[in-house]
């Protein structure tokens, strides 16, 4: 068994083999001073107290006390890898972004896959959307396409995002996952129906990270060299084929190998089985957007492929594992506002909210100079601006260059060629209620036409199996929403709930009771 282990299990062995005949490095403190003894503290006598002058101990312990940084408030559990994006089809008619400059061009990328609601130690095989974030290191700075494995989302207004995430996480008193919180929010916000239906379908538990699609999800804007703009959506189609886990296999793996997705990705790359995805775009003109039957910037809906076909762009290939997880994955920070010329945001309310929220949380989690961390640094562009100082400034702080603008001393100048595309909007300023913007039509299509009968059966079973743990009044609200999609959808879920609710609670947990030992009182006293 020990001779037939996978690359992830043998990482330490491989690291030693790579060093070959090299002698071990000299052990040092953080300050580089050689350490004479790493096994024993400096004390007064063998039983005496420690000394403050034991700098080997204080150096080690002080750093250990500060090892952990705040985990991501969402997408805490993840896996990362590196590779390249190669253009295979010309889309310069749509975008002047250098990443799409010519066929055959390669751009380095970093990718992070993740679950959403779980903590950093949670299982990879839970039913949860998957994050699918890609950082393109371009000559015009980083482009971060921060998406999921679904083309839609639970809400369409960013103001609801904190409450939505709170509902998916732990109860503030019990610190337990709470089905009442989850389903109460979903049932009160029927715009979640599309994503909830996707989540509880077979695709709700992907088989690792390699066998799922990715989506930019939001609507973006592409601008070409002539200043002409279109709206677009980004799609990554897995070249490995879609594979999903059954409920039973997912539960088994959550127990036996909670890091299943991370392990699978690492081993695939380590053995040269490089995963890849094909990038496509959908394109919509501004005039088409004006007459579109629904809001084209609504994140709870998709653009029909029959009307807006997928246009191939290129291929993403992952061919390198992280050298160190903390340095290259835990500190990896994606920001939707990182957009080079040729790619811009649309009026999508969720995207607009993320433009602020993502860099803001990175400054909290990693510090104001998080863009100087090597994995986040736009190393293919020359950063020149008027930002200075701050905690953990690791570069030369831009030397003696002026730190104010405008100035008369040959410091960085803005470039009119990088100006955003001019767009006209008009309308009243108010808080518009979008809760009832047709929450059912596309869900009905998904239920009746995308899924077959066996998939519909599993969808209803999965929903009922989770919804049964919520209070009855919440169950009724949720079933009404599913019935609004299609009467059969709601009735099938209700029938399954009725069966669950008729069953008496059973204690399926088997325990071992500790009986009295045969030790004498004297023997117990010596324990």
Curated annotation (Swiss-Prot):
Molecular function terms, GO-annotated: catalase activity; enzyme binding; heme binding; metal ion binding
Chain positions found as N6-acetyllysine: 233, 449, 480, 499
Keyword DNA repair on entry: no
Annotated signal peptide: none
Chain positions with Blocked amino end (Ala) modification: 2
Cofactor section: heme; NADP(+)
Entry keywords, A to Z: Acetylation, Heme, Hydrogen peroxide, Iron, Metal-binding, Mitogen, NADP, Oxidoreductase, Peroxidase, Peroxisome, Phosphoprotein
Chain positions with N-acetylalanine modification: 2
Subcellular location(s) per record: Peroxisome matrix
EC number: 1.11.1.6
Superkingdom of the source species: Eukaryota
Residue numbers carrying N6-succinyllysine: 13, 221, 449, 480
Protein family membership: Belongs to the catalase family.
Protein name, as recorded: Catalase
Organism per entry: Bos taurus (Bovine)
Gene name as annotated: CAT
């Amino acid at each position: 068994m020990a001779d037939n282990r996978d690359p992830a299990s043998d990482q330490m062995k491989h690291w030693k083999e790579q060093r070959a005949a090299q002698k071990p490095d000299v052990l040092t403190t953080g300050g580089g001073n050689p350490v004479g003894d790493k096994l024993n503290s400096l004390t007064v006598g063998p039983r005496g107290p420690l000394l403050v002058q034991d700098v080997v101990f204080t150096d080690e312990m002080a750093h250990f006390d500060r090892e952990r940084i705040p985990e991501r408030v969402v997408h805490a559990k993840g896996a990362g890898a590196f590779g390249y994006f190669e253009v295979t089809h010309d889309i310069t008619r749509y975008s002047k972004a250098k990443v799409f400059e010519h066929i055959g061009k390669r751009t380095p990328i970093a990718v992070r896959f993740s679950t959403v609601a779980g903590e950093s130690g949670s299982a990879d095989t839970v039913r949860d959307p998957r994050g699918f974030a890609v950082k393109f290191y371009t000559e015009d700075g980083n482009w971060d396409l921060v998406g999921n494995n679904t083309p839609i989302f639970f809400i369409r207004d960013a103001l609801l995002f904190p409450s939505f995430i709170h509902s998916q996480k732990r109860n503030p008193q019990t610190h337990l996952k709470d089905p009442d919180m989850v389903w109460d929010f979903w049932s009160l916000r029927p715009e979640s129906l599309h994503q909830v239906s996707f989540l509880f379908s077979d695709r709700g538990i992907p088989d690792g990270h390699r066998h799922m699609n990715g989506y930019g999800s939001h609507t973006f804007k592409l601008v070409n060299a002539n200043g002409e703009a279109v709206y677009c959506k980004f799609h990554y189609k897995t070249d490995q084929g879609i594979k999903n886990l059954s409920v039973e296999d997912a539960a088994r793996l959550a127990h036996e190998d909670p890091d299943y997705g991370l392990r699978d990705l690492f081993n695939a790359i380590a053995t040269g089985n490089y995963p890849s995805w094909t990038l496509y775009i959908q394109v919509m003109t501004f005039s088409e957007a004006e007459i579109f039957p629904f809001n084209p910037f609504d994140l709870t809906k998709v653009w029909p492929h029959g009307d807006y076909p997928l246009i191939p762009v290129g291929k993403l290939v992952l061919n390198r594992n992280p050298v160190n997880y903390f340095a290259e994955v835990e500190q990896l920070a994606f920001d939707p506002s990182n957009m080079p010329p040729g790619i811009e945001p649309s009026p999508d309310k969720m995207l607009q909210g993320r433009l602020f929220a993502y860099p803001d949380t990175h400054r909290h989690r990693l510090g104001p100079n998080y863009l100087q961390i090597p994995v986040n640094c736009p190393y293919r562009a020359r950063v020149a601006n008027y930002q200075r100082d701050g905690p953990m400034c690791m570069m030369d702080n831009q030397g003696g260059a002026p730190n104010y603008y405008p100035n008369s001393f040959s410091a960085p100048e803005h470039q009119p060629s990088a100006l955003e595309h001019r767009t006209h909007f008009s309308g009243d300023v108010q808080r518009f209620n979008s809760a009832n913007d047709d929450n059912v039509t596309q869900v009905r299509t998904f239920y009746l036409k995308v899924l077959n009968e066996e998939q519909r059966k599993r969808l209803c079973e999965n929903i009922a199996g989770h919804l049964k743990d919520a209070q009855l009044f919440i169950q009724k609200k949720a079933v009404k929403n599913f019935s609004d999609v299609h009467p059969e959808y709601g009735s099938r879920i209700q029938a399954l709930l009725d069966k669950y609710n008729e069953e008496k609670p059973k204690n399926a947990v088997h325990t071992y009771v500790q009986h009295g030992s045969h030790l004498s009182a004297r023997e117990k006293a010596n324990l």
